[in-house]
C-alpha cells in the first residue's frame, strides 16, 4: 500500500454489566463514578432536560443535580462535560455529559444516526475523565441507547500501552439505572471486536508477525465450540493451492507466509451458503523493492487492517451467536526487499491462471487478495466482502470520513450502507467502470498490470478494477479502508492511533444479512 499517515497507542479494558466482573463486596469497596447525560436546549427558554437515569439521580439527591448544573454555567453543549463532587453518597464523582439535541436521529446528509454518534462521543468523554481521576469503577447512563453507550465507553477507554512500563489504571464500566442489559452487552461485544482489531494493528510488527497473528485467533477461538473452526495454512499448502501472486510477495521476507481460515457455522441450516470475508494481511509493508519513504513507514505495521477487521468481525459474530454461516480468509505475509523479492517488471501467475506484470512492488496487497478471492469462490458463497488498506489514493479521495466501497451488487451495497448508518462507521460507493478495467488489462508482458497504465490517476479505482478480474461471484464488495486506518481526532470516541475501522460495520452487516432470507 502506498504511504499516507502516521499513528499511535492502546490498552485493554474489561467492560461489562454490574456484577459480572467483580464481587458485590469488592465493588462496593472501590471508588466509583457515574456518567450521566443531559440534552442540549432546543430553545433558550426551555428547562433543562436530563435522561431518565439523570432524573432518577436528581430525585434521589433532592434536585441538587439540576441546581448545580444551572449554577455551574450555560447549558452543556454536545460532547462537553462537567464534574460534580459529593452529590450522591454512592458516587463521590458524577460527570454530566452533553448529548446534543434530544430530537437528533438519522441525518440523511451525514448518513449516520446522529443520536447514536452523540451518545458514543459523550460517554467516551465522561469515561476518560473518570480514568484521569483514577476512578476504576464507572457506571454509565444508557442515555436512551444502551448499545451506543457501551460502544462509547469501551471504544473511548481503549489505549495501546502494552510496551510501556507506566500504564493508566484500567477502568471497568457498568450499565446504570436501566434494564437494557442485553443491548449494553451487545455494544460491549461490538466495541471489543473493534478494539481487538485496533490492538493487532497497533502492535509492533516484530510482535505481530503472520504466525503470531494466526496464533492470536487460534487462542481466542479455541473454546468457542464445535461450530467455530480455525485452519492455519502453511507455505506448503499455499504452494499446493498455486497462489503464485501471494507467494511472490511473501518471498521477500524471512517470515513465512500464513493463510488463516476461520469458519463459523451459526445457521441451523448447514447447507446455507456462507458470507465470505477476505482481508489483506500484510503485517509490515516496506514497499519491497519499490521502497517507501522512511518517514511514516512505521505506520505500515497496520497494513494488515483488512485481515484484523474481518477476523475480529467473525470472532464477534460467533460471540453474538448470529444465525449465519461466515468464513473469514486472511492471506498473511510481510512485504520486504530481500534478494528474492519481486522486482519491477516481474511476471507472476495467480491461482486462476492469469498472469500479472508487477510494475510496482508497493502495490502488493492486490496480489494477496487476487489469490484469496479466487479461493473464496470455492465455498459457493452467498456474498464475498473483502477489506484492505489498499491505496493511498483512497485516503486522498475520502480521507477518514468513510471507507470506499466498490461493488457489483446493489443488494450488497444497500446492506453495507444501512449497517454503516447504524454504526456511524460510514461507507461510500465508488465506481467500477470499464474505463478502469481497460487500464489494468493492457499490459506489455502479461494478462494484467498491477498498477494500470496511468499509474497516478484513479489509483483506488484501478486497484478495485484489478481485483474484479478475480471475481465471478454476482455479489462482491471491495472495501478500501486505507483512509480510515488511523485516527487523529476525527472520530471523537477513538483515541489517536489505529482505528480498527470498519469492524463494527462488518459485524452489523453480518447481523443484518442473517435476518435477510432473500434467496439470491
Curated annotation (Swiss-Prot):
- PANTHER family in alphabetical order: CYTOSOL AMINOPEPTIDASE, LEUCINE AMINOPEPTIDASE-RELATED
Name this polypeptide is given? Cytosol aminopeptidase
Q: Which of this chain's residues are annotated to bind Mg(2+)?
A: 285, 362, 364
Instruction: State whether keyword Kinase applies.
Output: no
Task: Describe its partners and assembly state.
Answer: Homohexamer.
Which key words tag this protein in UniProt? Aminopeptidase, Cytoplasm, Hydrolase, Magnesium, Manganese, Metal-binding, Protease, Zinc
Residues that, per the record, bind Zn(2+) 2: 280, 285, 303, 364
CDD domains according to UniProt: Peptidase_M17 (cd00433)
Q: Which InterPro entries match?
A: Leucine_aapep/pepB (IPR011356), Macro_dom-like (IPR043472), Peptidase_M17_C (IPR000819), Peptidase_M17_leu_NH2_pept (IPR023042), Peptidase_M17_N (IPR008283)
- This chain is encoded by the gene named lap3
Q: Name the EC number(s).
A: 3.4.11.1, 3.4.13.23, 3.4.11.5
Q: Which residues bind Zn(2+) 3?
A: 200-201, 301
According to its record, what are the GO cellular component terms?
cytoplasm
